[in-house]
């Protein structure tokens, strides 16, 4: 029998090449320093990461590494048949359908979105490297029948982002990565916002290094996108990871009403002001909502959700006039 440290020695040799170490780390979903700690014995991989590690290794090393890991970890065979990073469990999918079937209409969007984002954050960032996931919604069509902007809504993050990102929501337009994904109805990844200056318009915020926007579609119509940011470069290179993101995006789509999906031809996004400019307008948002709820005339029968949407429309109109 091999010594328990044999798998660490083998891993140390494999990750001796810095480029290969970085590639494997990206595939596993951890920092490259984490791989080094596994190799030198200062930390132990979580059970779910053992399978990811095997899949990320070059083919010529997998069989030998699997033998070493099976000797060091008696439960490796059990881990091998469990769902990996690239899969969403059928149990969780049924949970989402159950919520959709039983939740009240006015709570459906928030409840489903938050439930899916909580699970996605745990599965996509198990090591809490740093990730933010936000549901970005199309604003309703303006008076000319066109959709001119998008709005961030439900959002969750792991450190260095705050847990609940909904209070930090802002408008996004043609200048943003989300805007590009919604306009083209195609996924839009940027692997390094500090280096990538291609045609993709990135809306870079604090801590964000790589990002992906995945369109939320139904019957060839679009409702917005799922916007995910990571503190790590190249975080969205892994095909299994992007497939997982697609699955979570489809589940988020269940939070929307059919009429919230719009024909792509009416998407005509405008440029939106920067974050600091927008924040000055958001300070009185609650006052706007209360004024609409207390209003008379055509606005007097609004419920809270309707008043909030009307307040967002007022803010959108004001920002587009700047």
Residue ranges and their predicted role:
Residues 137-199:
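Regulatory sensory and allosteric helical modules in signal-transduction proteins
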Residues 245-253:
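Allosteric cytosolic regulatory segments
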Residues 88, 257-322:
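Signal-transducing coiled-coil/dimerization helices and immediately adjacent hinge/linker segments
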Residues 29-45:
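Recognition helix of helix-turn-helix/homeodomain-like DNA-binding domains
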Residues 230-245, 259, 263:
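Regulatory loop-to-helix N-cap segments in sensory/regulatory domains
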Residues 1-27:
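A short, Lys/Arg-rich alpha-helix, primarily the initiator
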Residues 174, 199-223:
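Helix-to-coil/beta transition segments that act as allosteric "coupling" elements at the rims
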Residues 47-67:
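DNA major-groove recognition helix of helix-turn-helix/homeodomain DNA-binding modules
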